[in-house]
Every structure is written in C-alpha cells, then in structure tokens.
C-alpha cells in the first residue's frame, strides 16, 4: 500500500508537469505543490466567513480558498459557522464586522481596499477594510500557498492609490483597437455578448492583482453603447464582475447628444445637453448602481470635444463630473490632446509640449471627482520617453498615470517585452517640483500635492484568445501592472519571479531562465527598434508594428526625428529649440537643457546633434545605432535558446506556443536590425566600423537566383528588403521557382528563408536541396494566432523568416524554392541564408 501511494504521488507530480494548459487560468492555476500529510495537517482545514452575502466579495473569497486548497494541496476546506476563536480555520471578514463581533484587535490603520493578513500555521485571519479588501487578502494568502510559502506572517497592506483601473479599447462590432489577443469578450455585432463566463474569469484575474475597475469600451467611443438594450447589457457585465469587487466604467463620445440624442448641439454649457447627459447617467446607474464612472477622450485625433464650441477642456470634463457626483462616480479625462497637423518646417513646433499647453492653465478648474489621465511620456507609449512634464504642472488637480499593457508600439505581443523596467523609469523619476522630492508615483497617489483622488490606468485589451493577450509571457505585464498599482516600490524582478512561480511552477531553472529572458527583453527591443530617445522607429502611419523610420517625419503627427544626411534628433531646449525642457521644474530642466548632462538614452529626444557626435560612451551616434541593433537581434536569438532549455519542464502546449513566438521574434529582429541600419547608412553614408551593415556573406539574394515564374519587385520602403528588391510570382495564380547552385563549402548548415507573409492569402513554399525536400510552409500568420496588425504589402510588417536547422549540403548542390501564390499573396521571397549552426547573420 505504501508503495502504491508513492507511485500515485510520483504519477501525480509527473502529470502536473506535463498536463496541457492553454493559459486561460493565467497565474491562478492553483497547481499542486509538494505538501505531505504532516505538512497538510499543519495548515487550516476549515474556512469561516463573517457576513458573507450571496455574490459578495467575501463569499467569493471563501469559494476561491476552497478551490485553491483543493487544487494546490488536495485539501477539502469545510465551512464552519463564525466564531471568534477560529483555530484550524481561515477566517475572512471585514475589520469593522470582526471588531463588532469579537474583541478589538491591534491592526494598523487600513485605507479602503486594504487588508490585514495573519498566518500562524493552521490558523489564518484575513481582515479587510471592506469586503473587497478581504477578497484581496484571500488571494494574497492563496498566492503564498501556491508558491509553497507556509511561513508565519502578520502584516497590513493598503493600496498606493484609490484608482487602479484597466481600460479596454473594445468596439461595439467586437473588434479591439490595438488588441492582439482575439475579439472582444464584451461586444459583438453592435451589442453586449450573451456569454459572461470570460468576463467573470477576467474579473477574477483582475481582482487577484487588486484592480478595482475596468472601462469596457474604446476611448474612441460609439454612442450606441448608450442605447437602452446596451445599458441592460452593461448591467450583465457589471453583475459578472461584482462578486470580484471589480466595478465597470464606460468611455463616452462627446458628441452623443447630437449623434444619438437628436439634439442640434453637444455644447457642454448648453442646458439641453447638460440635461441629456444627466438623464443618460441616471439611466446607467439604474442598470449599474455601482458604476465606477466615465472615461473621456476629447479634442484628440478626430474625436469631438468642447473646443468645437470654444469651451475649455475643464468645462467639458465638468459636464460629466457633475452628472456623476450624485452617485460617487469618477470622471477620467485623458490628457492625450494634441494637434495632429503640425508643420515640421517650424523649428519650434513640438507635439510633446501639447499636454502642458492644454492643461496647465486649467489647474484647479476641474471638479473634485475629475482625474486627468496622463500617458507616462509626452508622445505615445514609445520604447523610451522622458517623464511627461504634466505631472509636475497640476498642483490642484487629481492625476493618474496611463500605461499600456497592450504592446502597441512594442511588438504587439509577438515580441517578448517585459514592461515594468520601462514603467519604473517614469514612476521612480523625481520631478523636483519646488525643489522638493516629487516622485511621479507620489504625485499620482495624491501624496505630493495633498490630493484625495488619483492613481493608475492601463490599456490592456485582452480578447477571446485563451492566453488573453495572445502570448503566455505577455501576461507577466498585466500581473506586474496590478502589483505596481498597489505597491510601486516593488522590484520588477521580484514581481516577475512571483508571476513565474504562479504561472509555470517552482522549478528554479524555469524561474531563473524566464526572469533572465524577461529582464533582458526591453533593452533588447529598444536596441533593435529605436535608440537614444529617438522613439520606436515603427510605421506610425500604418500598423505601429514593423520598421519604417521614414514615417516619423514629413507629416503633421509630430513624432519627428529631424534626421538628415548630417544630423538627427529634436532640439527641445529653451536656448535654441522648441522650449520643451522649460516645461519641467528647474532642476530637471537644467539637466535636459545641457547636452553634456543629458543621459545618452534620451539624447536624441532633447538635442539635435551630428551623426558623428560622441556619446558619453565614447561611441558616435551612428555607430551606437549600428552596434545596438546588432546586439538587440543577438539577444532576441538568445531567447530561443534559453526557452528551448525549458523543454520538458513546461507543459507541451504552452512550451510550443511560446517557442513559436520567440522563433518569430528572432527572425523579425533581423528584419528590424537590417531595416534601421540600412536606412540610416543610406541616409548618412557613414559605414559601420565593424563592417557588418550591408555586408552579408552568407546570403543569397532571391533576385540573383535563376527565376521561372518569378519576377523581381522593388520593395517600398526600400530598407524592408535585403537588397531593396524581392521576387514575386508573375501573377497571383501561378507558381514560381527560384534556383541556385550552392557555392558554400560542404557541411551542415541552418538554412533561413526571409519572405513576406501578407494579409489576404496563404502562399505555399517548398525548399529543396539537391533531390531532397527540406521543408514546406504556408504564409498563414493571420490564421496562426500571431495577432499583430497585418499588412497587405511587402514591408517591414509582413517580412519574416523561417529557419531549417541542421541541413546537410554539398558544394554544387542545387537549392530550389517553389512558391505557389494564393489570394493577394504572390509567394514573395527576399533572400536565403546559409549559416553555420548557431551563427546569427
């Protein structure tokens, strides 16, 4: 019998290692941990809930604790009636209820949503300032148990700020703007979906990281959300979220009184408009009595706003704030207001100055329930930006920071980029307002300027993909956002390690590997995309995904690099530039005003310098570009090798899904590297001192091969092709063949093929060496859940690579690729590369 039990234990452990998982449970897997009979006997065996009403967060806490103990420890927690002496039990209650029923207890002062957790072996007490806080405490304790942490603890914790929201940019048709994880879980075909199971699971995940509200629809809002049938649907969403303490809010279209209400104006001072919005708000609160509030994007990127009627932004915001006040609702008003038709020939023009110019003079004119939602940088979620100076210019107005979990400019979940180290460059930044410590994190909490409201918002954009965001590793960013919103001084790496244990288990090699990959990922992505503060050199006019540095300039969007043959960068100084540095407090402005004191990683944000300018590192700007792009691509290839070392330590489904993305990222990093380096080499004529840029001895350009049914094609932008040229089939319904005789010495090689995977077709390619087929593949990224914004062109978005490893070749063998066109995709090819195994070209 003892032998059988041991066998069953070993079998259970093995099954827990290899059982397929799809990511739907996120970090709430409640995976089994080793805990023998003696271990389990030292833990609670009962759960006691005080004042648990149906659907309340405290009832949810009890349900989660039971499910967690059963899954993690195979222990069946039984419910026990409340008693003050709760030995061998987990007691969950609000602090006030506990004090009314039992003796007073020495617990530090708690803020709303805070909790006290005391764990003494088989007796655990979780006391929340409110029911939501009690639920947070239950999740905290379960996270300890799930990480096999059974230590004795007694501590109180309260949130950094009262507002800890997430934003979804979901559209009424079910699409998601800047969403890369599938369709909306909230909307479809103009109405609210029937199935609330994914909504409930999302709320569960959010509650476990202490997020207290979600704005369910796009800031580019559709007024039809305010139709009665959709208000009723919002009520169902709120009902699904309420047991987890998650409130819902909605984004509003400023012109709704005219577009939906039949009025001939949406002037925020018009009595009819004011009455219309009050009536809408009253109606919404009948369906959602605990609605968190509204989010408004106005006078920005074509969205209507108060400026149409020559009204101020504060007058526009206060219209909604006053309608919400009887219900305790909050109005989040985005500071993302700027002119998208700037004149680049004006040396003083600067989009980065817009937020301060629009909002500073309105400080103190907003209602007390208005919170200005400020992006972390002054442009738009770039790979690196300086801290928005608006945080230092609103003394008498509530503020919140806006982050983006959805990787709009940062690889769209197809590239691994762990974001907290980026976020912390802003959160930990000291703005030195009035020469006093002024960390951004202390400004948004309200502490610095004695504000009672403020906090956090993050654009998340989960979808129907079972991984939520499209990528298993991208979920670390959502988890970390919640952790930082509660406690912004937590270390990025510690958060990551906790997430990894909860998501992938206790294996030290797994934890160390994922931690190393993730902590390296943001610097690597910055290296192969945009350096020295120049911003992410992506296509800002199209997908925001692949490389296209020319799109930054010669348009009115204001994300300019001002790059030319001789020099690069925006002069934002007071002395000779746009004056942007003057928007910062004196101590910070002084640092950025001087080229000598500006850190290298922001030098091109603040200064216009020659390409030959030497950085503090001693390297010229152009050589830094070349070096960084090669280093970044090298690091991306390293991620694949690191991940492959985890084979067998992670379940097959998640291992393979993540491996395919990392392989794709490695190939796309080469596309990025070459595009940026070639673009600026072509612009400057300054060679790479290491001789790498434009020199690829391992490559065979497709246009140099013998072509039958293929023709050459000039790619635009030129840098999106290795030699500015690709090949495509002569028509979209034909087959093309490209052949060449291999000149490389006989041996074993990795063969990479760079091609273009266009939206709207699934071409088929077959690669042969000699008389043997090496491999076949389809151009099916749009059907293979990759999820990034697709392209219908041969460009840096559609460019990708497939690699076949360990192929034996003989000098003189014929290498042949047959491409079969499909749809709009003409089986396009860029080049073939023969590499000694392990070499990055």
Swiss-Prot record:
GO molecular function: alpha-glucuronidase activity
InterPro entries: A-glucoronidase_C_sf, Glyco_hydro_67_aGlcAse, Glyco_hydro_67_aGlcAse_N, Glyco_hydro_67_C, Glyco_hydro_67_cat, Glycoside_hydrolase_SF, Hex-like_dom2
Gene3D superfamilies: Alpha-glucuronidase, C-terminal domain, Chitobiase/beta-hexosaminidase domain 2-like, Glycosidases
Matches recorded under CDD domains: CBM6-CBM35-CBM36_like
One biological process term in Gene Ontology: xylan catabolic process
Claim: Hydrolase is one of the keywords in the record: yes
Cysteines joined through disulfide linkages: none
GO CC term, one of those recorded: extracellular region
Subcellular compartments: Secreted
Annotated signal sequence range: 1-20
EC number: 3.2.1.139
The keyword Metal-binding is assigned to this record: no
Induction or repression: Expressed in the presence of D-xylose and L-arabinose and at very low level in the presence of D-glucuronic acid. Expression is under the control of the xylanolytic transcriptional activator xlnR and the carbon catabolite repressor creA.
SUPFAM superfamilies reported for this sequence: (Trans)glycosidases, beta-N-acetylhexosaminidase-like domain
Domain of life: Eukaryota
Glycan attachment residues as annotated in the record: 51, 76, 85, 149, 222, 279, 310, 343, 450, 465, 527, 576, 682, 723, 732
Keywords, in A-Z order: Carbohydrate metabolism, Glycoprotein, Glycosidase, Hydrolase, Polysaccharide degradation, Secreted, Signal, Xylan degradation
Catalytic activity: an alpha-D-glucuronoside + H2O = D-glucuronate + an alcohol
Family: Belongs to the glycosyl hydrolase 67 family.
Function description: Alpha-glucuronidase involved in the hydrolysis of xylan, a major structural heterogeneous polysaccharide found in plant biomass representing the second most abundant polysaccharide in the biosphere, after cellulose. Releases 4-O-methylglucuronic acid from xylan.
Annotated PANTHER family: ALPHA-GLUCURONIDASE A
Protein name stated in the entry: Probable alpha-glucuronidase A
Gene (name only): aguA
């Amino acid at each position: 019998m003892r032998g059988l039990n041991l066998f069953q234990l070993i079998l259970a452990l093995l099954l827990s290692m290899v059982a397929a998982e799809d990511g739907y449970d996120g970090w709430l897997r409640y995976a089994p941990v080793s805990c023998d009979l003696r271990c389990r006997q030292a833990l609670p065996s009962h759960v006691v809930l005080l004042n648990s009403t149906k659907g309340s967060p405290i009832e949810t806490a009890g349900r989660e604790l039971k499910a967690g103990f059963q899954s993690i420890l195979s222990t069946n927690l039984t419910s026990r009636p409340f008693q003050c002496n709760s030995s061998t039990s987990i007691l969950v209650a609000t602090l006030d209820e506990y004090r009314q029923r039992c003796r007073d207890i020495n617990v530090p002062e708690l803020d709303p949503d805070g909790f006290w957790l005391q764990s003494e072996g088989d007796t655990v007490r979780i006391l929340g300032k409110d029911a939501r806080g009690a639920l947070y405490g239950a999740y905290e304790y379960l996270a300890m148990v799930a990480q096999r942490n059974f230590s004795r603890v007694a501590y109180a914790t309260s949130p950094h700020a009262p507002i800890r929201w997430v934003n979804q940019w979901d559209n009424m048709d079910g699409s998601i703007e800047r969403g890369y994880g599938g369709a909306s879980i909230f909307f479809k075909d103009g109405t609210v979906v029937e199935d609330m199971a994914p909504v409930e699971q999302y709320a569960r995940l959010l509650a476990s990281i202490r997020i207290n509200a979600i704005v369910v629809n796009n800031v580019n809002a559709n007024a039809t959300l305010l139709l009665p049938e959709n208000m009723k649907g919002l009520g169902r969403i709120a009902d699904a979220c309420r047991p987890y303490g998650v409130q819902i809010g909605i984004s509003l279209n400023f012109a709704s009184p005219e577009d939906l209400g039949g009025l001939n104006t949406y002037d925020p001072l018009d009595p009819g408009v004011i009455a219309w919005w009050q009536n809408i708000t009253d109606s919404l609160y009948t369906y959602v009595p605990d609605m968190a509030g509204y989010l408004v994007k106005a006078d920005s990127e074509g969205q209507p706003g108060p400026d149409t009627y020559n009204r101020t932004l504060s007058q526009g915001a206060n219209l909604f704030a006053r309608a919400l006040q009887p219900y305790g609702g909050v109005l989040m008003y985005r500071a993302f207001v700027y002119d998208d038709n700037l004149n680049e020939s004006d040396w003083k023009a600067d989009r980065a100055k817009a937020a301060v110019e629009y909002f500073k003079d309105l400080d103190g004119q907003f209602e007390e329930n208005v919170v200005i939602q400020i992006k972390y940088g002054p442009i738009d979620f770039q790979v690196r930006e300086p801290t928005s100076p608006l945080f230092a210019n609103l003394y008498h107005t509530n503020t919140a920071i806006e982050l983006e979990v959805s990787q709009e400019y940062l690889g769209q979940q197809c590239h691994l980029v762990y974001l907290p180290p980026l976020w912390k460059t802003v959160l930990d930044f000291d703005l030195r307002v009035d020469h006093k410590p002024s960390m951004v994190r202390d400004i948004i909490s309200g502490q610095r300027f004695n504000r009672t409201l403020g906090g956090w918002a993050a654009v998340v954009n989960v979808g129907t993909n079972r991984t939520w965001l499209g990528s298993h590793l991208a979920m670390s960013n959502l988890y970390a956002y919640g952790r930082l919103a509660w406690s912004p001084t937590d270390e990025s790496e510690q958060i990551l390690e906790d997430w990894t244990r909860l998501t992938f288990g206790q294996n030290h090699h797994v934890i160390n590997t994922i931690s190393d990959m993730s902590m390296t990922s943001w610097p690597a992505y910055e290296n192969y995309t945009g350096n020295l503060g120049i911003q992410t050199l992506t296509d800002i006019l199209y997908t925001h995904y692949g490389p296209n540095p020319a799109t930054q300039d010669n348009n009115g969007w204001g994300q300019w690099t001002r790059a030319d043959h001789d020099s690069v960068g925006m002069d934002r100084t007071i002395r000779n530039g746009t004056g942007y540095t003057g928007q910062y407090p004196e101590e910070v402005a002084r640092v950025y005003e001087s080229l000598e004191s500006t850190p290298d990683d922001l030098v091109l944000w603040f200064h216009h310098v020659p390409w030959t300018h030497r950085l503090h590192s001693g390297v010229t700007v152009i050589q830094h570009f070349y070096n960084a792009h090669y280093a970044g691509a090298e690091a991306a290839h390293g991620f694949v090798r690191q991940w492959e070392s985890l084979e067998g330590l992670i379940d097959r489904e998640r291992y393979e899904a993540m491996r395919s993305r990392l392989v794709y990222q490695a190939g796309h990093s080469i596309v990025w590297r070459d595009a940026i380096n070639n673009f600026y080499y072509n612009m400057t004529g300054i060679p790479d001192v290491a001789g790498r840029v434009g020199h690829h001895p391992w490559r065979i350009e497709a246009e140099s091969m013998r072509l039958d049914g293929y023709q050459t094609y000039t790619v635009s932008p030129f840098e999106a092709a290795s030699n500015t040229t690709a090949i495509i089939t002569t028509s979209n319904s034909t087959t093309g063949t490209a052949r060449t005789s291999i000149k490389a010495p006989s041996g074993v090689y990795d063969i990479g093929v760079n091609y273009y995977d266009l939206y709207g077709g699934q071409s088929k390619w077959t690669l042969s060496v000699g008389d043997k087929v090496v491999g076949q593949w389809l151009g099916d990224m749009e059907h293979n859940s990759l999820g990034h914004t697709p392209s219908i062109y041969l460009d840096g978005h559609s460019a990708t690579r497939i690699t076949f490893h360990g192929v034996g070749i003989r000098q003189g063998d014929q290498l042949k690729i047959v491409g079969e066109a499909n749809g709009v995709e003409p089986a396009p090819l860029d080049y073939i590369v023969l590499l000694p195994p392990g070499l990055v070209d």
